[in-house]
Amino acid sequence: MKMIMNIRQRLNKNYNELNGLYHEISMKLGLSDSKSMVMYMLYDIQEPLTQSDIVKATGLSKQTLNSAIRKLEKEGIIILEKLNEKSKKIVMTDKGQVLIEQKMKPLVDMEDRVLASWTEEDRRKYLELIEKFKVQFEKEVKAYDKRK
């Protein structure tokens, strides 16, 4: 059990330090973490998203996300288009596409260089294990809900 605890601690330490690095690059890009996450997703996925898509993918609270979206909208980076009665899709403006490209491409390029420096086997293994951890942890979270 001590070995599992050490692995969990190392995992959490690396996860937290990685989050710190994303925060650091967001600051260097002149962005809040939440604006950076929204812009990153729009850049990476290259299609309109809903607020619920972003909440689900990032874990941001609805309030934090809404605040970031309002700021991006006010700055002319995005517009909200009605999707249905309950949802609006977040769409990049022309100005937003240029700005998001300028801000997010350097970050994505950094990630790509790191991944390109790994062997194909390391990339495959990393994805396999992180996906396996996520799936099993998701089951644990759902099981916890049932115990309450």
At which residue positions do the language-model features occur?
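N-terminal helix-turn-helix DNA-binding core of bacterial DNA-binding proteins
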Residues: G20-T64
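N-terminal positioning helix adjacent to the helix-turn-helix/winged-helix DNA-binding module
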Residues: I7, S34-K35, T50, K95, ...
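C-terminal regulatory/oligomerization modules of transcriptional regulators
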Residues: M1, E121-K148
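Alpha-helical linker/hinge and terminal dimerization helices associated
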Residues: L11-N14, L18-Y22, L99, K103-W118, ...
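Hydrophobic structural patches
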Residues: L11, M39-L42, I130
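Charged, amphipathic alpha-helical coiled-coil/dimerization segments
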Residues: R70-E128
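N-terminal leader segment of winged-helix/HTH proteins
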Residues: M1-L29
